[in-house]
Amino acid sequence: MGKIIELNEALANQIAAGEVVERPASVVKELVENSIDAGSSKIIINVEEAGLRLIEVIDNGLGLEKEDVALALRRHATSKIKDSADLFRIRTLGFRGEALPSIASVSQMTIETSTAEEESGTKLVAKGGNIETLEPLAKRVGTKISVANLFYNTPARLKYIKSLQAELSHITDIINRLSLAHPEISFTLVNEGKEFLKTAGNGDLRQVIAAIYGIGTAKKMRQIKGSDLDFELTGYVSLPELTRANRNYITILINGRFIKNFLLNRAILEGYGNRLMVGRFPFAILSIKIDPTLADVNVHPTKQEVRLSKERELMALISKAIDEALSEGVLIPEALENLQGRAKEKESLSVQTELPLQNNPLYYDNVRQDFYVREEATFKINKNQASNDSSEQTFDNFTENQLNTDAVSEKMTDRTVESTTEITDNSLENTVSNFEIDFDNEAKISQSSTFPQLEYLAQLHATYLLCQSKEGLYLVDQHAAQERIKYEYWKDKIGEVSMEQQILLAPYLFTLAKNDFIVLAEKKDLLHEAGVFLEEYGENQFILREHPIWLKETEIEKSINEMIDIILSSKEFSLKKYRHDLAAMVACKSSIKANHPLDAESARALLAELATCKNPYSCAHGRPTIVHFSGDDIQKMFRRIQETHRSKAASWKDFE
């Protein structure tokens, strides 16, 4: 008798769930993506115990017809593709037909759904993938799917679940990414009756950024645009002063789908060039529209890995768009924000991307001229059971029955409010949508500005140049400023191979390990791009008989060794990066250092040269060359700006 048997469908679904349903966040992702594919404009996600006890997704999409409800729990049953040709032009987020049966096989699932054409809805209850009941339900256009007791029948999976806070953080991150991908949809995330995130769904991506990362972050984002025959690129990137220590704040979207792609991440960093500090990464939300035939999403069950045709062309488009956006405006960081930035960074990390413990209201401090959140404020939502009335319900009525929220005043109160404030659905929506920053006006101001006309005052600690203009006080780092000047000079020079060479009376010999000798022998032409000509000389040796005139004779051996190290350490060698690294190295080593006194004439000459640079705002390594104290900043420090705490609260436009 043969040993191979065909597994029953329930067991096959549990096996598939091992790939599709890694954790509660995977369930949230699949269900919300189904709601998006159904054309929903409002989606509510309720979770309890980080999704282990309950995940509930409610939408106002097209809904399922009665005969399709039971079929939806069958493996590879889908309405999104019909033949093999459709597999190569996928326009929906889901298409495999694996998610619902896989989720149902490891949970207790309830589906309540109805279409606009049907007179009543349908309710399905399944346990472990087996349908227990299928009955009619009061009509409400859209779908509500409840997933209870996740992994109840696969206890081994629970051993690998991290803390509830960690799992909830993953869920929050998923909703953040989907909100950024679809600003036209209103998303509401509720955990244990507390609202974590609410977006307005008005199509304004920057308002979504403000809801997720905070108003301060949204104000420091610059819009990017670009297109060619194959791609259309839109989105926002942060100013170089707004960075984080990892790539978690970079969101890349292909046709509305969040993906992970190392090469596109690298293209973003190349667009910033040397405006970023080493080891720092920007905020970026890039939305890329592409012909579906150029993207293969059928690579991994999570569909986060996508193979792209013409990937190099897309990288070039991204880098160019970011570089152009950042070249249009003044990139001088505000000094007070720079001083407070590191202290605020940990606080800002907790806004939506990491897990916020409570969603507190915004207040406006007229003295600080900034928004703040009262620590004492608490969040209250009364959750009632949905009405069982057989009459037809609208989506808004349905969600009100689920969350039972009350309207409150749209005004933002001052610090004298009571210590406990009730937050409602409407008030939180006002925070996102009614306070609208005049982002366009801000962008116009930045784009019309130029490098300031600086009047030199004095040198501070033989390191910084104090200057003033009508905009306020400026501090210039003399080393960083000269490094920027020399970097731009050497970058151009290194790109030009001059015939003018200085003959060495005593040639230099460079001895390498055998493996390094082989690599350098193959790549030595790259040194020719910088005017450095090495010849093979004996075993494992190169000889240098002449050097470019821009290279100081006292620094020849050290500089050539560093050039060799750059080539040997680069697995994927880029001539552009090589020239940058080499120019940065030469510029840094030859620039004036800290504690170097300068007379007034030299200081003014340095400032004049800095003003002529293509990018005068940062050195070759991304450190700022100049910081700014505005007149208001200085007056605030001396308490010369005083307003009562009971002044009328400002809107986002007033804040600008």
Curated annotation (Swiss-Prot):
An individual GO BP term: mismatch repair
GO molecular function: ATP binding; ATP hydrolysis activity; ATP-dependent DNA damage sensor activity; mismatched DNA binding
Keywords noted in UniProt: DNA damage, DNA repair
A single Gene Ontology CC term: mismatch repair complex
Keyword DNA damage: yes
Role played: This protein is involved in the repair of mismatches in DNA. It is required for dam-dependent methyl-directed DNA mismatch repair. May act as a 'molecular matchmaker', a protein that promotes the formation of a stable complex between two or more DNA-binding proteins in an ATP-dependent manner without itself being part of a final effector complex.
The family this protein is said to belong to: Belongs to the DNA mismatch repair MutL/HexB family.
Name of the protein described by the UniProt record: DNA mismatch repair protein MutL
Organism: Lactococcus lactis subsp. lactis (strain IL1403) (Streptococcus lactis)
